[in-house]
Amino acid sequence: MCKRIVGLLLFMVLLCMPLRAESMYRDTCYSLRTDVGYAYNIVYGHHATFNMGAMLPINRNFEGEISARATTANTYTIGLRVQPKFPIKRNDKDCGEVLLETHVLYNRFQRNHMHGLAAAFSVGYRWEYVYAKVGYGMSMMAAMVMSQHTTENSIFEPHNLVYYLEIFARPHTSSWNISACITDMTDFQMERMFTPIFILRSYVDVTEQWRLYFSGQCKPVGIANQAASFFGAEMSTGASYRF
């Protein structure tokens, strides 16, 4: 499954490479994105994913993001991310930026009559070819019906190391790119620190407003733990529009 995802993603990247070389997405701006995907794991089997998100920058140094996911496996997620940014300059030269991120997720597993909440606080650094962050996370899961809240069907994980490392083939402001990432928290899930998620991404700017992107990810373990998401492997494609 993971080999197929990687192969398809690389093929789509090769198709996009001839497009323009300079990015039109250099500045923080309001944008909307949507994508659809296919996912599979041993718990929910084959299912489709539908994601939407909105980037809501207040200014060049502070931005927020709202995201939502629904799947045909009757799982639902709402995410909120806020991120102050602090540019670093040395001798009037741009040396990247430091980011302070707060990320909150609400997950609803309708089929299992469970829901969960996860939150993470991290410090990150982003420059031309790298985006890295590390922080502290916590999560809990419980039955939806209050009368069923017992020690047996509610779990609280107060301590978790959150990490994210993404390496880009070209400067991240380029008009097309491909990247490889390892993390334990994405837009729609937070895993335990020893359950890494491997992600391969690409994007291409087709106009000043429109960006197309592709993503494939796999998680070799983690289906049985309380923080596990809805898939062991997933591939998706979508578009974003910048205002």
PLM region descriptions:
Residues 1-31, 243:
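Cleavable N-terminal export/targeting peptides
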Residues 21-72, 242:
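Short glycine/proline- and aromatic-enriched beta-strand/turn motifs that initiate or cap beta-hairpins
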Residues 180-184, 189-243:
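Predominantly the C-terminal beta-signal and adjacent terminal strand-loop region
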Residues 30, 44-50, 74-80, 96-98, ...:
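Residues that define the transmembrane beta-barrel architecture of outer-membrane proteins
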Residues 116-188:
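Detector for outer-membrane/organellar transmembrane beta-barrel domains
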Residues 34-40, 66-70, 82, 100-106, ...:
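Transmembrane beta-barrel strands of outer-membrane/channel proteins
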Residues 59-66, 88-100, 128-134, 140-142, ...:
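Repeated loop/turn-to-beta-strand initiation elements of outer-membrane beta-barrel proteins
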Residues 36-38, 52-56, 80-86, 119-127, ...:
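Residues on the lipid-exposed face of transmembrane beta-strands in outer-membrane beta-barrel proteins
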